[in-house]
Amino acid sequence: MIFNQTEKQEKEYLQQVITTIHDTINTTSTSVKEHIDTLQEYKDYLWSNKDIDPHEIRSMRESILNHFALGENVIDKRRRLSKILDIPYFGRIDFQEKKDKSQVSPIYIGIHTFYDLNQKKNLIYDWRAPISSMFYDHELGEAFYSSPAGKINGTISLKRQYRIRKGKMEYMIESSVTVHDDILQKELCSNADNKMKNIVTTIQREQNQIIRNENASVLIIQGVAGSGKTSIALHRIAYLLYAQKGQISSKDILIISPNKVFADYISNVLPELGEETVPETSMGQILSDVIDNKYKHQNFFEQVTELLENPTPDFIERIQYKASFEFISLLDKFILYMENNYFKATDIKLTKYITIPAEFINEQFKRFHRYPIRQRFETMTDYILEMMQLQYNLTVSTPEKNQLKKEIKKMFAGNNALQIYKDFFEWIGKPEMFKTRKNRILEYADLAPLAYLHIALNGNNAQSYVKHLLIDEMQDYSPIQYKVIQKLYPCRKTILGDTSQSVNPYGSSTANMIQKAFATGEIMKLCKSYRSTFEITSFAQKIQPNNELEPIMRHGEHPKILPFKNTEEEIQGIADLVNSFRNSHYTSLGIICKTESQAKELVQKFQIYANDISLLSNQSSAYVKGIIITSAHMAKGLEFDEVIIPQTDDKNYHSNIDKSMLYVATTRAMHKLTLTYSVSSPSCRFL
């Protein structure tokens, strides 16, 4: 007989589970109060008895720490239970182990495990638990999961999905497949939110394989636009924190994200899944830190802006060259050349009677070749003085030792990293490939090679505290940047992005290039696009074709291209579209321009029409829901119910990078897409 066979029985059972959760929360609240009271008693006792002996103090300290730890665990348990009250679970499988023919176990699956002490059993299993993997990976019939005890085989006889909101079951669906299409379609039809949401209820089989992959030391995820790759990567982090509890915590993970807005946009996912937020940084910040923030330089946003607004063939060539593997190979050869030619040993007069021969000093420089060049000077000095002491019984003072090290350091002709970098371009016969801007500002493309050289000279100062590194928007980083990351972070990595969405096409990386840069890596692909309707996805495919992309069969309005007589009429037309949006059921509208300067100009023009429009710029630190005007670069990774793309004429969109920006902009739309342009310019070649 099936446990809770009817919907009525399921609804009654849900209320029983919620009641049990409430009871457990009340019990934990009582327990928290007891721990607080006990800690206060200890505090009062210590305050009143200042003459107690050290043994008693030590014993009490242990008791206090123990109560404090227990109290924190109980508070954490209460927090987790409070989180699941509204939606205790979302799925169920009935599983019978092969070895146990009589017992069919109903497995209810939710965000967190809930174990009832009275019944002595799990009422809810965490979605990350080994047994829960069958919900995502298997249909009805034979199934298995991997447990610490080994592979468990059996049969799934029932699979259900539920929509529960605020403790009430809205509906349940019998499902023979992994995630029922009706559930998926309902979730995809919902409005965009101001924060990325968890997707545990709709994780697909191919996504689940990525989330639970614990074998790959470097996992590279190539995911098409709208495939959920960022969300999947964050769910993967949540899974690893669960599966490797005790070995890794949220503070051991680092996310490299494109900007502060995107970092804010994704900040809710891990807390929703019951984990703490993870530290984040940017590639630019990492590279600046390596070179000790010594040099003024372009940032990535400024490089992209220049490529969009004022590109020159020389600038593009410099970016492309520094993103090649040939460039890395030559840089490695130059580092070897520098080791063999930049150190010119000379005799050092240590005392009136003792001279250290240049040949001996040169031998020591080569002896310690495993050390980074500038780290050798200290080791060489110690070794030379040790030899002098053995041979001449000579004792040297600290100032004399420092003077010797200073003399040895002077023998190396490369104490200015920037000058060495310039030397490199002379050495390869391409001095034109290095160019500083006004006020000696470096180009962004020079930052990673300079950091790479700095590591060769000074050592990598490996960030060993980071146990897992997550890199988003992988396509926007060059191979030399990945080489620097390899040296700084020798940990496991999850790297994700989409080659079709590069805002840096002249210095970008494909999944295969990243694999080559790390000399390892497992590539997994996400080809299904869930964000946009079939019509919007098909439209975007004409701009940037991708044969691997599989659109979801969710239909909606066809994208519109609206021509206007002139710019003034185009602005008025966009204002009318904004008014239509206000009267719709949609909650987010993105007006996406090619550049930030165009976005700022549009905001100025719109001041006479509305005061509820926000500018999302490179200076922004948070994503705001509602009507937003922004650039394609800043919109990357975000999604909107409706998108309007102004100025889609051939004058504005004509280059390769323009095409990438247009593709990024169109793929931000979930339900509705409109492009506008003035007929005073030719229509866009990409449409």
Predicted regions and their residues:
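P-loop NTPase Walker
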Residues: M1-K33, Q40, L184-Q303, K636, ...
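Extended, charged low-complexity regulatory segments
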Residues: M1-V200, Q204, N208-R212
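Generic detector of solvent-exposed, compositionally biased contiguous segments
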Residues: P54-N73, I211-S217, Q222-V224, G228-S231, ...
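A structural signal for short, well-ordered beta-strand segments and their strand-loop junctions
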Residues: R92-D94, I220, I255, T674-Y677
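Conserved phosphate/pyrophosphate-binding and hydrolysis machinery centered on Walker-type P-loop NTPases
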Residues: C189, D193, Y321, R370, ...
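Phosphate/oxyanion-binding active-site loops and adjacent basic polyanion-contact surfaces
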Residues: K195, I199, K229-A233, D446, ...
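Alpha-helical nucleic-acid-binding subdomain
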Residues: L241-L469, D476-V484, R492
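Conserved helicase motor core of SF1/SF2 NTP-dependent helicases
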Residues: G246-Q247, K251, K260-E276, T281-I286, ...
